[in-house]
Amino acid sequence: MKVRSIGFTKKVANLLALIVFGGVMPNAVAQSNYFVSSSSGDDKNNGLTVSNPWASMSRVSQEVLRPGDTVYFKSGDRFTGQLVIDESGTALAPIHFSAYGKGDLPVIDGAEMPGGAPLASVLIVDQDHLELSKLNIKNFRKKKRNGVVDTDAYGVLVKNTGKRNLRGYNFHDLVVEDIFPIQARKSFNKTSVTGIRFETHPAKSKKSAYNTGDIYIHNNFLRHTARFGIALRHGSSHIKGVRGSVSDYDVDVRIINNRCEDTGGTCVLFNGVWNGLLEKNSFIRSGAMVEPNLSVNRGSGAWFFRSKNIVAQHNVAIGSRGHNDSAGMHVDFGNENVLVQYNFSFDNEGYGTEILGKNKNVIWRYNISVHDGTRLVGVERPEGGKSSFPGKTLFVSDFSKPKRIQSKDIYIYNNTYVIAASSDPLVELNGRDMHLWNNLFVVDDGGRMGAKVTVGWQGGKVLDMQGNVFSGDVSPNFIRLDSNPVIAVIGFDGPPDKPETYAVDSAQFGTNRTGVAINHPIFRASGKGIFSHVAAEPEFDIFYNAIGSGLDVVGAGYRNKDLVLQP
């Protein structure tokens, strides 16, 4: 108690000094580096040098950190308890938490906190301009803590309670793993357990309409969580004048070059995001049963809900499992202006392409889907129960809440779909103004596609389908929907889980191989902000062949003598 009293007094004194001098002489206080070592430190040290480190995270939390300060945790050490970050940096001088020394990343494990496991190992409430790097964050909660629900757990939790706009988060080179609650929730949709989570409260008035933005999460490794790897959720406001405005969304979110594997649920969720970029990530075995009694056991590499201006490109999704969803990626309901391109998905049992209801302008192009949509109904599943949601190669649904509403302006073109032997995926197309152009559908020997084909109609124009190529046992009912189909014999030779295997030799098409001319739909947010590198219209296929250079235009991409795959 004596040490805490001293720390509290120092914190108050430092805070008063900042109030008195901070606004007048913002550069008068030098930026400081602090060092923390659980193996050799002492909280009575000044913490300013490697030879005089603090020992605990509670000591870190007592210090008033200033913009530009850095707190270094010693590599190879283990820190038990919760890191509470209750100061903000600035745009030019963020506060940084990282590692020093050689060895394994320092471990921050909230689950071992005295008095019971906290909600999150790293907790940030209403603070911004922060950087986290080179830390191993865990929180497998097993001991109850007063005032903390047993059914939630987070590695890093960032909360915006609606006091102001929050900006500037740079989280990189982290390992976030083993994030599980004490007990599971019964409701799938109410389960929010996450490795890295941003949560923004919905506005209760126009004056409190704030959001969180400038979020950059990159080069991290996430695994073993009860549901999400990374999740961003801005609660939807019911206030007129706020609902649907940019203040009702988190803004400018970049999720780049992360690897996420063996999560109980989805690797990445965008819920209420305005301008979101999902690029060069790997989603491996979402819906995994690492801790089946604590997890939702229902995946999808990534999905988007109630969001605007979303780009998902150059991602890989492999091995999603679950009784529902479990696609490589899917567009849930209530989105607008979504571009999904240049992605590779393999062995995701739910769907090859999944787009639910109440969406506007969804563009799905130059993707490769291999052996997706294999889920069977009416058979016992590894997690228990039986699924009533059969696997589908194409799944455009009108599902939304509170009522079903068809999506409109759906463009699915120049994709390659490969259907696995011994699988029998269905097709459902239930939307308005849908376009299926120049896709390549190849069924491996022993497989079948489209035994049941459903096309929904509620009035108006439904389906414009032309220029697609079909190989193998594809339902005549599906082929007949195409006004200009091509039947071919296509085979692939190479590792099934490598995208380059599906770079088609254009000679296999003979003389009927060019598909139909396309007026490309426009991604309206291209060329500016976080989308400055995203073209409004595609300039190349998935294998970086220039579009319009005389190469064929069926499927996601072609092999040619000059083909060089990008990293």
PLM regions and their residue ranges:
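Acidic glycine-/aspartate-rich tracts in secreted/extracellular proteins
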Residues: 39-44, 76-78, 89, 101-104, ...
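Beta-solenoid repeat scaffold
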Residues: 33, 63-109, 123-135, 164-175
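Acidic Gly/Asp/Thr-rich repetitive segments characteristic of extracellular carbohydrate-active
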Residues: 38-74, 78, 115-118, 543-551
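Bacterial N-terminal signal peptides
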Residues: 13-24
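Glycine- and acidic/polar-rich repeat regions and solenoidal domains
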Residues: 82, 114-124, 138-167, 177-214, ...
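Surface beta-loop-beta hairpin patches that serve as ligand-binding interfaces in beta-rich domains
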Residues: 480, 490-567
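Boundary at the C-terminal end of the N-terminal hydrophobic targeting segment
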Residues: 28-32
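N-terminal secretory signal peptides that target proteins for export/translocation
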Residues: 1-9
